[in-house]
Amino acid sequence: EKVESWGIKDATLVNASGLNNSYLGENIYPGTDKDDENLMSAKDVAIVARHLLKDYPEALETAKTPTKIFAEGTTSQVEMVNWNWMLPGFLNYKEGVDGLKTGTTDLAGACFVGIMIKDGQRIITVVLNATNHEEDPSARFIETAKLMDYTYANWKKEEVLPAGSRLPDMTTIKVKDGEELTTKVSLKSAVSLWVRNDMD
């Protein structure tokens, strides 16, 4: 129900882990098969990532942490290393990248949801089933860097309607049972959109 309210209509979701059901043993969702797996388009994954960042911004703090030591100073001390190689200190570091999630399954291949902020503008990229991942473990990050570079080189966020603007086809609206039968309509806030650099 939640993803449908976000406009995601054709995804197949069988669990919250993202793993194939075969890893979950007896803990699979009733009515799903033991080998079922979540299926989503790149667009759907980007929508989920956008909502994660908007609704739970604190998740970004975890996503951008390169390494974390648990149970420090004890005999159970464990260092966990982030699988996102685009973070500072890693092989595929790219300035501005601060998340978000890697994933690999037999069906989906090597995947990565990358997020980056540059000049105050954040983008979300999604790479699914990166080619040659078995030969080059950096493949998903190389393709992500290409997407990020292309986006910032060819697109920009631009204010298309300032606050107070009136829409040509909607300068007034009817007011039921009001003292006045119509009232003027204008935008409370400015409207900005991503537009191609070559568009006027």
PLM regions and their residue ranges:
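Domain-terminus/edge residues, biased toward the C-terminal soluble/receptor-binding domains
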Residues: 25-200
